[in-house]
Amino acid sequence: MKIIAVIPARYASTRFPAKLMQDLGGKTVILRTYQAAVETNLFDDVFVVTDSELIYNEIITNAGKAIMSIKEHESGSDRIAEAIQNLEVDIVVNVQGDEPFINKEPLEEVIQVFRNDTHKKVDLASLMRNITHKNDIQNPNNVKVIVDQKGFALYFSRSVIPYPREENVGVRYMQHIGIYAFRKQALLDFYHLPMLSLEASEKLEQLRYLEYGKRIKMIETTHVGIGIDTLEDLEKARSML
C-alpha cells in the first residue's frame, strides 16, 4: 500500500497573508512543515501542492517535491485531487501547511484505519476530540461531528449538534480535527462531483463526501495541532524553537 502526504499551500490567506513564507527560526513555515512531514518516516513520498511560484520554488530549491496547481479551487480536497490524479498511490494524507510542529501520532492513527480496513469499507479517515466547554461547543469555527456506533461520521456542522433539548443524557460533543487520509478514488470522485446544498450552506467540504455516500471513519484523539493563523501564532511558534 503506497501512502503519500500532500500539503496544500495557498499563498493568499484572509487572516494572515503570505503566512507560509514567514520566517520561523531561519526557515519558512512551509519548508518546516514539509521537512517535518518527511521526517515522520510515515510516507513513501511528500508533496507540497501550491498555486504560488514563490512557495513552489521555496520547496524545490531546498531539495523538496512540489506540484503547481493548475486551476483555482474551492477546497483543499479539490486542489489535492488535481495534483494526485496521475500519481500511483493508494492512500493520500492531507497535512496542513501551517502546522510546522507535526505530531506523528495522529497521522499514524488515520493511516492505521486503512491498514485495518481489509474489506475496503472506509473511504476517508479523520480525527475528532471531545470538547466540554460551552463556548467551544457553541463556537461556529469549531466544527462538530456526530458519529454512529462504529465511529462513522453521520454529519458535520458549525451548529451545536446534537441540540441539547435534554441535557442530562450523557452526550459527548466532538470537534472535528482537520487531518484527513483518503483513498485515491474517493478524492477523484470528490473532484468530479458538483457541490450540493449542505456543503454550500455550511462551507464544509467534508459534507460533499457524505452527501454522495462516502464513508468517513472518525478516530478520537487528544491531539491539538499548533497552527499559524495570525502574527501572534507566529510569535508563539518562534518562542517554541
Swiss-Prot record:
State its location(s).
Cytoplasm
Q: What is the lineage of its organism?
A: Bacteria, Pseudomonadati, Bacteroidota, Flavobacteriia, Flavobacteriales
> What CDD domains does its record include?
CMP-KDO-Synthetase
InterPro entries per the UniProt record, alphabetical? Cytidylyl_trans (IPR003329), KdsB (IPR004528), Nucleotide-diphossugar_trans (IPR029044)
Keywords from UniProt, A to Z, are: Cytoplasm, Lipopolysaccharide biosynthesis, Nucleotidyltransferase, Transferase
Looking up NCBIfam families in the UniProt record yields: kdsB, PRK05450.1-5, PRK13368.1
Kindly give the SUPFAM superfamilies that the UniProt entry links to this protein: Nucleotide-diphospho-sugar transferases (SSF53448)
What's the family?
Answer: Belongs to the KdsB family.
Q: Name one GO molecular function term.
A: 3-deoxy-manno-octulosonate cytidylyltransferase activity
Write one Pfam family the protein is assigned to: CTP_transf_3
Pathway annotation: Nucleotide-sugar biosynthesis; CMP-3-deoxy-D-manno-octulosonate biosynthesis; CMP-3-deoxy-D-manno-octulosonate from 3-deoxy-D-manno-octulosonate and CTP: step 1/1; Bacterial outer membrane biogenesis; lipopolysaccharide biosynthesis
Q: A Gene Ontology CC term for this entry? A: cytosol
Annotated catalysed reactions:
3-deoxy-alpha-D-manno-oct-2-ulosonate + CTP = CMP-3-deoxy-beta-D-manno-octulosonate + diphosphate
**What role does this protein play?**
Activates KDO (a required 8-carbon sugar) for incorporation into bacterial lipopolysaccharide in Gram-negative bacteria.
Which is a GO BP term held by this UniProt record? CMP-keto-3-deoxy-D-manno-octulosonic acid biosynthetic process
Its recorded name reads 3-deoxy-manno-octulosonate cytidylyltransferase
Q: What is its EC number?
A: 2.7.7.38
